[in-house]
UniProtKB/Swiss-Prot annotation:
Pfam families documented for this protein: RNase_T, SAP
Record's GO cellular component terms: cytoplasm
Domain Exonuclease: 151-330
Classification via CDD domains: ERI-1_3'hExo_like
Gene: eri-1
Region ranges (Disordered): 27-61, 515-582
Domain of life: Eukaryota
Biased composition (Low complexity): 529-548, 572-582
The protein's name in its UniProt record: 3'-5' exonuclease eri-1
Source species of the chain: Caenorhabditis elegans
Bias type Basic and acidic residues, positions: 34-61, 515-524
Length: 582
C-alpha cells in the first residue's frame, strides 16, 4: 500500500460523510417542494381527512381476529355477610368447637384439627375481612383513627444509680397522658408515685436525676395499689372495657418490656396483657424521618421535638412532663398523616423472621456466646435483661397489626380452652383462687408483724463506665443487632394440686442468675427479703399519690386489688377493640 492510498478506516469515514450529505440534500429538496405547493383550503383539508377515515373504515378484520367488547365484571364479594363477620370477631373467644367449624364451613375452609387450630384458622380469615370492612366504612379517615380512639402516653421514672449496668430498676413514678385521637388533643392526665421495695432508700444520683424526694416515695403507695389507681382513672374513660380501642405510646421499648415486666415480677403478679403490646414512637419516628440525631447531648424526646419544630415543655426526667411531650410528638405526627400503630410487643416466643433475614441469622449464630466484657455497657445491660426476663421483646409488622395476629397469646390458650372441660377448668380456677387468698393473707400477716422495713443499698460497680443521662443512650437498635443472639426461655406454668404445698413467690435469684449474674450481684440480692415479706400497701398513706385529672369527678379506690390484677386472663385472639378488661 502506497502512502497516497487511503486506509480502510479512511474509506469508511468518507463513505459515512457521503451518506450524510445525500440525506441532507434530499431533506432540502423535500422542503423546497412543499414551499412551492399552494396552501390547501379548509374544504380540501376536510375532504382529505374524510377520505382517510373512509379508507380506514373500509379495512375488513377477519372474524376470528375480532375481539368482542368486554362486559363489566363485578368485584368479588365476601362469602359471608358483614354482620356475621362482626359477630364472629366479637364472640371468637367464647365460640365452641362446633361453632368454629360452622364459621369455617361458611368460607369453605377445612374444619379439621383441634379447637386451638380451628380458632386460629377462623381468626386468620375473619380478621382480614374485618379490616377491609373498617377501611370501606371510613375510607378518608385519619390512619391512626381507624384503629384507636385514644392513646395513652407513658414514661416511667425508676430507681437508679450513676452506673446503670445490671441494676434492678423499680418504678417510682407512674404517669399517664390521655390523647383523644379524633380531636388530636390531650384530654386528661394522671400521676402517682410508687414506694420502692428492693431499694427503698433512693440514691443521691436518683434524687438529683428525677427530682423526686425521699419523703415523696416514703409516703407513696406500693406498686399494686398504684396500678389499681391507674386502672380506676382509665375506667372513667371506659378504657380497658369491652369494645374500647386504645394503645400505650412509649419513647423506646424499655418502659413496658423491661421496667413494667420486672416490676410485675417483683410484685408477684402476671404482667397485664394490655401492657404487652405498645407503640414505640421512637421506632416509628426513625422510619418516617430517616433516623434520629445522636450524640448532641439531647435526649431522644428533645431531638424528636426539635425535628417537628416543637419545644420541650416542663422539667426533664419528670415522668409526667416527659409523657406530656411524648403526647405532643404523637399529636404532631398524626397531624402529618403519619400512621401510629402497634409496632412492638412482649411475648414468650419470638416472632418468625422473614426468609430474607435467615442468612443474616446464620451469620449471627456464632455471636451467641459473645464476651460481654468487650461490648458497650448499655448493650451489655440490654443483653443481660433479654436473657433474664421471660417475656421477650419482638417487632410487630404492619401485616401482623392489620390482621391482629400480634394479639395471639399462647400463654392463655390452655386456660381458655378448658372451659368446655368443666372439671379441668374448675380445678384450675380453684387453684388460682387459693393462691390469691393465701397471698393476700401472707401480705396482711407480714405487714401486721413487721411493718415498714429497710433494705441495704446495692453496691455500685466501679469497673463500668459511668452514664450521666440514661435517656441519651439510644439502644433502640439493640433489638435488631442482638435480637437473634439471645436464647429463648420457654416459660411453662406449673400449678400444683390444692392439697400440696403452694408457693406464690417468684424465685428472683433464679431470674437474676440467668446468663450473667455474678457472685457479688447475687450476694446483694440475697440480702433482700422474699416477696412474702413485702409490706401491704394498706400501710401506706392515702395522701401519697399526686394525681392530675382534668375531669371533675373525684377518685375513689375501693376495688379489690388482687381480684383486679389476678383475674383469669382472656384469650386475646379477638379484635383489638376487645382489649382485655380489668
Amino acid at each position: 500500500m502506497s502512502a497516497d492510498e487511503p486506509s480502510p478506516e479512511d474509506e469508511k469515514y468518507l463513505e459515512s460523510l457521503r451518506d450524510l450529505l445525500k440525506i441532507s440534500q434530499e431533506f432540502d429538496a423535500s422542503n423546497a417542494k412543499q414551499n412551492d405547493e399552494p396552501e390547501k383550503t379548509a374544504v380540501e383539508v376536510e375532504s382529505a381527512e374524510t377520505r382517510t377515515d373512509e379508507s380506514e373504515k373500509s379495512i375488513d378484520i377477519p372474524r376470528e381476529q375480532q375481539l368482542l367488547p368486554s362486559e363489566r365484571v363485578e368485584p368479588l364479594k365476601s362469602m359471608v355477610e358483614p354482620e356475621y363477620v362482626k359477630k364472629v370477631i366479637r364472640q371468637m373467644d367464647t365460640m365452641t368447637a362446633e361453632q368454629l367449624k360452622q364459621a369455617l364451613m361458611k368460607i369453605k375452609v377445612s374444619t379439621g384439627g383441634n379447637k386451638k387450630t380451628l380458632r386460629k384458622r377462623v381468626a386468620q380469615y375473619y380478621r382480614k375481612e374485618n379490616a377491609l370492612l373498617n377501611r370501606k366504612m371510613e375510607p378518608n379517615a385519619d390512619k391512626t383513627a381507624r384503629f384507636f380512639d385514644y392513646l395513652i402516653a407513658i414514661d416511667f421514672e425508676c430507681t437508679c444509680v450513676e452506673i446503670i449496668y445490671d441494676y434492678p430498676h423499680e418504678i417510682i413514678e407512674l404517669p399517664a397522658v390521655l390523647i383523644d385521637v379524633r380531636e388530636m388533643k390531650i384530654i386528661s392526665e394522671f400521676r402517682t408515685y410508687v414506694r420502692p421495695v428492693r431499694n427503698p432508700k433512693l440514691s443521691e444520683f436518683c434524687m438529683q436525676f428525677t427530682k423526686i424526694a425521699q419523703e415523696t416515695v416514703d409516703a407513696a403507695p406500693y406498686f399494686r395499689e398504684a396500678l389499681q389507681r391507674l386502672y380506676t382513672w382509665m375506667r372513667k374513660f371506659n378504657l380497658g372495657q369491652k369494645n374500647s380501642r386504645f394503645a400505650f405510646v412509649t419513647d423506646g421499648p424499655h418502659d413496658m418490656w423491661k421496667f413494667m415486666q420486672f416490676q410485675c415480677l417483683l410484685s408477684n403478679i402476671r404482667m397485664p396483657h394490655m401492657f404487652r403490646s405498645f407503640i414505640n414512637i421512637k421506632k416509628t419516628f426513625k422510619e418516617k424521618f430517616n433516623g434520629l440525631i445522636k450524640g448532641n447531648g439531647k435526649s431522644g424526646i428533645e431531638n424528636m421535638l426539635e425535628r417537628l419544630d416543637l419545644s420541650f415543655v416542663g422539667n426533664k426526667h419528670s415522668g409526667l412532663d416527659d409523657a406530656t411531650n411524648i403526647a405532643a410528638i404523637a399529636i404532631q405526627m398524626m397531624k402529618l398523616k403519619i400512621e401510629l400503630r402497634i409496632n412492638q410487643k412482649c411475648s414468650y416466643k419470638e416472632n418468625q423472621r422473614s426468609a430474607a433475614r435467615k442468612d443474616e441469622e446464620r451469620e449471627l449464630e456464632d455471636a451467641a456466646n459473645v464476651d460481654l466484657t468487650s461490648v458497650d455497657i448499655s448493650r451489655r445491660d440490654f443483653q443481660l435483661w433479654m436473657r433474664r426476663l421471660p417475656l421477650k421483646l419482638s417487632s410487630v409488622t404492619r401485616r401482623e397489626f392489620i390482621n391482629e395476629e400480634y394479639l395471639d397469646c399462647d400463654s392463655c390458650d390452655d386456660l381458655t380452652d378448658d372451659k368446655n372441660d368443666e372439671a379441668a377448668f374448675q380445678e384450675k380456677m380453684a387453684i388460682r383462687e387459693y393462691l390469691e387468698n393465701k397471698q393476700t393473707e401472707d401480705f396482711a400477716k407480714i405487714a401486721a408483724e413487721r411493718g415498714i422495713f429497710k433494705i441495704g443499698e446495692i453496691k455500685s460497680y466501679q469497673t463500668a463506665r459511668p452514664i450521666i443521662e440514661d435517656d441519651d443512650v439510644d439502644v433502640e437498635s439493640e433489638e435488631e443487632d442482638y435480637g437473634t443472639e439471645f436464647e429463648m426461655l420457654e416459660v411453662v406454668e406449673r400449678m400444683p394440686p390444692v392439697s400440696s404445698t403452694l408457693h406464690t413467690e417468684v424465685d428472683l435469684d433464679a431470674v437474676w442468675e440467668r446468663d450473667g449474674g455474678s457472685d457479688s450481684e447475687r450476694e446483694n440480692l440475697s440480702n433482700a427479703p422474699s416477696l412474702h415479706e413485702f409490706p401491704s400497701s394498706s400501710t401506706s398513706s392515702p395522701h401519697a399519690t399526686s394525681e392530675h385529672v382534668t375531669s371533675s369527678s373525684p377518685l375513689h379506690i375501693d376495688d379489690d386489688v388482687d381480684r383486679v390484677l389476678n383475674a383469669p386472663p382472656k384469650n386475646s385472639l379477638a379484635s383489638s377493640s376487645n382489649r382485655s378488661s380489668f
